[in-house]
Amino acid sequence: MRCLLDTHIVIWAMVGSKKLSSRARSMLQDTENVFYVSSASIWEVAIKHSARPDEIPVTAEQMIRFCRNSGIWELPVQFRHSQAVSSLPPHHNDPFDRMLVAQAREEGLSLLSHDRQLPPYGEFVIFV
């Protein structure tokens, strides 16, 4: 399975959070799966960590290093991803999450998330 990881899934994996479900852990450990992180997630962490480091315990640099060391591929934001956001129904107002939904949909990826507002976007969203 090819999966785009929601930002919080990567952060929880990095810090060993108990919030990461056993299903998510199992999927992350399955070597048959290929994982991607959006450059929008790195941007989100850079913004939110500088504003609220107590809530976002990792830096963008740490997240990049973790992804590279873990074999998680970078998914850059492309023009078509940005355009696809405009056609999404308004299930969620968070611009970072909307970008991840658009990217997953455009690239034919599953989106692994623990955000309850994302599953209404379609079956490609896997709530873990």
Please place each PLM-identified region on the residue numbering.
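Alpha-helix capping/helix-boundary segments
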Residues: 9, 41-42, 81, 100, ...
